[in-house]
Amino acid sequence: MQEMTPYELLGGAGVVRWLTDRFYDIMESDPSVKPLRDMHPADLAASREKLYMFLSGWLGGPQLFIEKFGHPRLRMRHMPFAVDSEARDMWMKCMNQAVNELLCEDWLKAKLLEAFYNTADFMRNQQE
């Protein structure tokens, strides 16, 4: 029996879209993450779509980002931005809230948040 992917465990495309949209809604509405919001364009439509496509594949679903843009090269794509531990923590604050609003299962929350943290931490490009 094949193990289900996180994408399948979450419920597929609709749930990944909700998670992405909620993440950005939190970023837009929480003044404590304004420096993170300021790293993004005024119109978040393209950012929302790219994160949705990335998360789809990253979670084990359709590789939408790769099909459209090629390999994600996350660190390279984030090099124009000063990503330090504060930016990582703001990103995680938004994602943590979105994941906690979405999921009831503690084991799945913990698994996802650990993976998100590891990825967000890898994005840091500023010496501290």
Which ranges hold each PLM region?
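Core of compact, soluble alpha-helical bundle domains
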Residues: 1-128
